[in-house]
UniProtKB/Swiss-Prot annotation:
Cell compartments where the protein resides: Cytoplasm
Signal sequence, renumbered to the chain: none
Gene it is expressed from: infB
Cross-referenced PANTHER family: TR-TYPE G DOMAIN-CONTAINING PROTEIN, TRANSLATION INITIATION FACTOR IF-2-RELATED
Protein name per UniProt: Translation initiation factor IF-2
Residue numbers spanned by region G5: 532-534
Protein residues bound to GTP: 396-403, 442-446, 496-499
InterPro entries: EF-G-like_DII, EFTu-like_2, IF2_II, IF2_N, P-loop_NTPase, Small_GTP-bd, T_Tr_GTP-bd_dom, TF_IF2_bacterial-like
UniProt-annotated stretches for the region G2: 421-425
Length: 881
């Protein structure tokens, strides 16, 4: 065995020696050893030869004027190329191999990429590698141009010493072009610490650079990729700058890597960007407040109206504390509710030990007149006052002849054109009589126009109480007396219809005395006059009495003062817009003057009298129809003249701003109606004038019932428009039109949306119609009326019909298709319909008492012998309000 092993090893050694000799490795080893010895000699004798050669090479590239031999030019100007296929890694760069090892092109093309730029074997022209580092100023260096001497091939000396490891090997490829990194001995050197130069200014000229030793420059500052290959350690990468690379283009390395944040999660941060410029967000910290006792005020001043929230803020309390205290006292409010009662606000303040005063400064600013018309006249200089015509209001019960009596005085025929022969609007007229001018107010007598009568009593100076001699004092007559007494106005009684045969003045005197109006004929102070509107009897005496009362009252006014008065009626005209009938109480109203009402303003454009004649001025106690208003004022609103329209607009704007502050407060639902499950009739009212709306709405709201109630969604003046119809369709409401019509283009919409619209000219007809609609909402009351009863004697089973009951009629009549109750031991087991009734196999409509019959119940099969079948019918009765 040992012999065989020795023989095998000997054969391997001989074979390896033959291979080495064939490849020429022994000669290469000798050349390498000889080259190493020559390098050491050259370096010791001329250490700066390589540096000079590098400078000369650089000069030859930059300065073409330098003369050189063709050999030197070819060797210096053309850059040296690294060819892995014809150089051995064991040979130094300065030596040239005479016989390069041939390598196939396939092997070179499949070589992996390296960090150095390696030219392909097919390149024919040399490549010039530009130096990207800032050039060194040549002026500061004194370099002698030495012509390069051609390198002589040293003699090959074979040494037996083993080859030393080469430190400066640039290429990592062997003679076959494959990696030999694992065969090379790796030696590491600590990098030298060098002071980094300061960044240079970017300019076109090269900056001066301090001179360095040739050794330092050759070791640390390589000027070309070829010259620094042997000086750099093999473990360092090529640090030569590529074109376009500069320290400004390089991203700074973050020593403290940034933590992953939410912005990274959503891709908002770019990892390559430097985010150090971002300002760090300051973390919010809880503020610690010093706890101290809140000193609540003991005396405050608040305006009215005010919300619960604002009142609590003024009192330094929580709104919940106020609401809790008010709930204890039986008042339910929420935080946004408005308090407009002075007593309620002051009571809340006393509960918390705070005195509350009402601040009226804002209201005083918006209030133009600080006193009433009567107070203003009393404060005026008597020399400026003149006697004005009396304002007389005719009041009384409906159909007692008020309007007819006025027609007789004015020689007019107003009553003939009134719908239903009753007055439903308030009229103002100027009447010239033998005793002087009189302003007459005609008020409605129907119970629905109570507000109109109240306004008439407040405006007028004398009330003429018209009483029909054949009917006597009625309900509205008593109401008119109450209004007159409340306004402290003189009453003159006109006993009308004295031409009728059943006229009895003594009965009227007795009724007047019962209400503390003792007539003069009975020794009292109440003036009474017997009149007849048809014959004109007693009219002169009535006028004389009115003139006498006006003289006693000493009615005066100041015509030079600014005009003040009251709105009698207002309406919406198609061509003129908002118009109003006003009555001047003091001063004189001229065309073009600006007026301020409660919630609107205007500039008088036109004025007309009751005969539609133009007027330029309106003196005291004179009514007029004016136009040019911003909106429609309410009946009974006072007005006053201001300097110009701008002031009037500003005043109304301030008033409306205060009203709109609380306009958005929602109406609280009627919890009583919700608990009682009351039904609601929703209405939309349209009328010709503001007074008619007021009268109709008040009459409807007076309809009181525990089962149903009326709710007015909207009320306005004018014709029924498309917006009203759409509102009614959306809210399922009924539109009530009073003395008005429907717009032409809105009639088709009524049919398409199916809205119910009812038009009326007489107010009590409208009120009666509303009552009927409210009654129709109520479910009718069902009443069960017994018709007869029968006892079950036998039961029969049928596969087709079910159970058939043989019965004997004990009471009344059993009728087919009527309701039936099955009663057992006085307990009702079932209610249903009697579907079939037979008498001796014949269908009959009814079976009377004492007869037998067969009965089939619809949907019930569980009746037994002895049960009672009671036949009854259901009668529905409408409910009453």
């Amino acid at each position: 065995m040992e012999k065989a092993k020795l023989t095998k090893n000997l054969k391997l050694k001989i074979k390896n020696a033959q291979l080495t000799k064939a490849a020429g490795l022994d000669k290469l080893k000798q050349k390498l050893a000889q080259a190493g010895s020559s390098d050491t000699k050259n370096s010791s004798e001329k250490p700066s030869a390589k540096v000079a050669e590098k400078v000369v090479k650089k000069k030859s590239v930059v300065d073409p004027s330098v003369s050189a031999t063709p050999e030197s030019v070819s060797s210096e100007t053309s850059p040296r190329r690294i060819r892995a296929k014809n150089r051995s890694s064991f040979v130094s760069e300065d030596l040239e191999v005479s016989s390069p090892v041939p390598v196939d092109s396939d092997t070179t093309s499949s070589m992996p990429p390296v960090e150095e730029e390696i030219a392909s074997s097919t390149d024919s022209e040399p490549e010039v590698i530009e130096v990207t580092q800032p050039p060194i100023e040549e002026k500061s260096e004194v370099v002698t141009k030495v012509p390069p001497t051609p390198l002589k091939e040293p003699e090959v000396v074979v040494k037996k010493d083993p080859p030393k490891s080469v430190v400066g090997i640039k290429s990592n490829f062997g003679p076959t072009g494959k990696h030999i990194n694992h065969l090379l001995a790796k030696t590491f050197k600590a990098p030298k610490k060098e002071d980094k130069p300061a960044p240079k200014e970017r300019s076109g000229q090269a900056q001066a650079k301090p001179q360095q030793s040739s050794e330092a420059s050759s070791e640390n500052k390589p000027h070309s990729p070829n010259n620094n290959r042997s000086s750099q350690p093999f473990y360092r990468r090529d640090t030569s700058k590529k074109p376009g690379s500069d320290f400004r283009d390089r991203a700074k390395k973050d020593d403290n890597p940034k933590a992953f944040t939410g912005r990274d999660r959503y891709g908002l941060n770019d990892g390559s960007d430097d985010d150090k410029w971002r300002k760090k967000r300051v973390q919010k910290t809880k503020k610690h407040y010093d706890e101290h006792t809140i000193q609540r005020p003991t005396h405050i001043k608040v305006p009215l109206p005010i919300t619960i929230k604002d009142l609590a803020a003024e009192m330094k309390l929580k709104a919940s504390e106020l609401i809790q205290k008010m709930f204890i006292h039986g008042m339910t409010y929420v935080v946004n509710d408005v308090l407009d009662n002075e007593t309620t606000v002051q009571f809340i303040g006393l509960e918390f030990g705070c005195t509350i005063d009402i601040d009226s400064s804002e209201q005083d600013k918006l209030c133009i007149e600080s006193n009433t018309v009567k107070e203003e006249i009393q404060e005026t200089d008597p020399s400026k006052l003149i006697i004005r015509p009396p304002i007389v209001a005719f009041m009384g019960h409906v159909d007692h002849g008020k309007t007819t009596l006025i027609d007789s005085l004015r020689k007019s025929n107003i009553a003939a054109v009134e719908a239903g022969a009753i007055t439903q609007h308030m009229g103002a007229f100027c009447c010239s009589t033998p005793v002087g001018n009189i302003t007459i107010l005609d008020t409605p007598g129907h119970e629905a126009f109570s507000a109109m009568r109240a306004r008439g009593a407040e405006v007028c100076d004398i009330v003429v109480l018209v009483v029909a001699g054949d009917e006597g004092i009625k309900e509205q007559t008593l109401e008119a007396v109450k209004h007159a007494r409340a306004a402290n106005i003189t009453i003159v009684v006109a006993i009308n219809k004295c031409d009728k045969p059943n006229f009895n003045a003594e009965t009227i005197y007795r009724q007047l005395s019962e209400i503390n109006l003792l007539p003069e004929a009975w020794g009292g102070t109440t003036v009474t006059v017997n009149t007849s509107a048809k014959t004109g009897e007693g009219l002169p005496e009535l006028l004389e009495m009115l003139a006498l009362q006006a003289e006693v009252l000493e009615l005066k006014a100041n015509p030079s003062a600014r005009a003040r008065g009251i709105v009698i009626e207002s309406e919406l005209h198609k061509g003129l817009g908002a118009v109003a009938t006003i009555l001047v109480q003091n001063g004189t109203l001229h065309l073009g003057e600006a007026l301020v009402f409660n919630d609107c303003y205007g500039k008088v454009k036109t004025m007309h009298d009751e005969h539609n004649r133009l007027m330029k001025v309106a003196s005291p106690s004179v009514p007029a129809l004016i136009t040019g208003l911003s909106s429609m004022p309410k009946a009974g609103d006072p007005f006053v003249v201001v300097k110009n329209e701008k002031i009037a607009k500003d005043i109304i704007g301030a008033r409306l701003a205060g009203q709109q502050k609380f306009a958005l407060q929602k109406k609280r639902p009627n919890f009583d109606a919700m608990l009682q499950n009351k039904k609601i009739l929703k209405l939309i009212i349209k009328a010709d004038v503001q007074g008619s709306i007021e009268a109709l709405a008040s009459s409807i709201l007076k309809i009181v019932s525990d089962k149903v109630s009326a709710e007015i969604l909207s009320n306005s003046v004018g014709e029924i428009s498309e917006s009203d119809i759409r509102l009614a369709a959306a809210s399922k409401a009924v539109i009530i039109g009073f003395h008005t019509g429907i717009e032409s283009h809105a009639e088709s919409l009524i049919k398409s949306l199916g809205v119910k619209v009812q038009l009326f000219n007489i107010i009590y007809h409208a009120v009666d119609a509303v009552k009927e609609m409210m009654t129709a909402l109520l479910d009718p009351i069902a009443e069960e009326k017994n018709l007869g009863s029968a006892e079950i004697k036998e039961t029969f089973k049928s596969s087709q019909l079910g159970t058939i009951y043989g019965c004997l009629v004990s009471e009344g009549v059993m009728t087919r298709n009527q309701k039936v109750r099955v009663v057992r031991n006085n307990d009702v087991l079932w209610k249903g319909t009697l579907s079939s009734l037979k008498r001796i196999k014949e269908d009959v409509k009814e079976v009377k008492k004492g007869l037998e019959c067969g009965i089939l119940l619809e949907g019930y099969q569980n009746a037994q012998v002895g049960d009672i079948l009671q036949c009854y019918e259901v009668i529905y009765h409408p409910q009453k309000l």
